[in-house]
A protein has these predicted regions:
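Solvent-exposed, low-complexity, repeat-rich "mucin-like" stalks and linkers
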Residues: 27-64
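Protein-protein interaction and targeting regions used for scaffolding, dimerization, and localization
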Residues: 7, 31, 37-42, 48, ...
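Solvent-exposed, conformationally flexible loop/turn segments
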Residues: 16-19, 43-45, 79-80
């Protein structure tokens, strides 16, 4: 046993005769994280990763060396975790240090999470680790939508799928649909429902009996929904997008959607092109997984949403009369 500067360490030697031995004892004086790990932000339940972390031990004689063989605690991130303790032992001496981490608490109940938290989970591509298709969160729609004022409508948005059709529409996305009222799938209707009208701002696909210009140039996309807005935080005025809550709009991501953007009734494959949308309607194929009326080439670029593939009802009801079925644009 030897002591140096208050540090004690031991080593075992074998004495075979009357001989003098010089024993070098390696004594750890301190340990430090000299390069932070690559990943420092976690969600609750994730496992700490030391990848990229460099741990340096200072010996009692003042020398330094990069070490491995350290241990880390805790390994599973909890809501109250702010740092991970790193421990290293050598020569019978254990020294510790800490490295800071940030842990975001995730509730498995979708509605208990803020939209900012949901966005963070979406960005990490981990939505399905915490929530399920069909899970819902309540919002309030408030504002003028086209020519109709909707005042403080409580409605739930629900998950249609995780990373839906990601290779075409964009990765790390959670797709939601608006919406349900007390569990009933609804469509928003206005005072012109079931009547022909040329009124600008009515909930119609176009203001005349035409599909010229397809989805891209439709009255529904631009004037009613505001789906073509350049930013969800700067939406086109008097659109559904503008009437959504600000905290939801702050985290919305656009998706690349494929549809017939020429129109005219000719079933021409080249008419199917992409648009960037913040608030698109679902297509026939996304609802049904089959095509009857849409351009037959659309389905080559689309996928049925998991929510509807699971057999959930596609019947919509009027948002202001939830016992009355309604036709839905698609």
């Amino acid at each position: 046993t030897a002591t140096l500067n208050g540090h004690t360490a031991s080593a075992v030697v074998e004495v075979t005769g009357a001989m003098q031995y010089n024993v070098d004892l390696v004594i750890t004086s301190s340990v430090a994280v000299t390069h932070a790990p690559t990943k420092t932000s976690y969600f609750t339940g994730e496992t700490f990763s030391s990848a990229g972390m460099v741990v340096t031990a200072t010996m009692a004689d003042g020398s330094k060396k990069t070490v491995t063989g350290y241990t880390c605690s805790p390994t599973t991130m909890a809501a109250n975790t702010t740092a991970v303790t790193v421990s290293y032992s050598e020569g019978g001496v254990t020294k510790t240090t800490t490295t800071p981490v940030t842990v975001t608490s995730i509730s498995n109940t979708l509605a208990s999470n803020s939209w900012a938290t949901i966005r963070a989970v979406s960005d990490a591509g981990k939505g399905s680790n915490y929530w399920s298709v069909g899970d819902a969160k309540g919002i309030t729609i408030n504002g003028k939508v086209g020519a109709t004022t909707i005042s403080n409508l409580a409605i739930s948005v629900f998950i249609l799928g995780f990373n839906h059709n990601a290779s075409r529409e964009g990765s790390n996305r959670i797709h939601f649909q608006i919406g349900k009222i007390n569990g009933t799938l609804v469509g928003l209707v206005d005072g012109n429902y079931s009547n022909y009208t040329s009124t600008t701002g009515a909930f119609t696909m176009n203001t005349s009996n035409t599909n010229s210009g397809g989805w891209n140039n439709s009255h529904m996309r631009k004037t009613v929904l505001g789906s073509n807005s350049t930013s969800a935080t700067s939406p086109t005025a008097n659109t559904l997008l503008a009437a959504l809550p600000a905290d939801l709009r702050a985290v919305m991501k656009p998706a690349t959607k494929y549809s017939d953007n020429t129109g005219g009734g000719s079933d021409t494959a080249s008419y199917v092109t992409s648009t960037t949308d913040l608030l698109p309607l679902l297509s026939e194929f996304e609802y049904h997984g089959a095509r009857s009326y849409a351009n037959s080439a659309e389905k080559n670029y689309q996928a049925q949403y998991d929510y509807y593939r699971a057999g959930n009802s596609k019947v919509h009801y009027r948002h202001n009369a939830t016992g009355t079925a309604a036709g839905a644009w698609c």
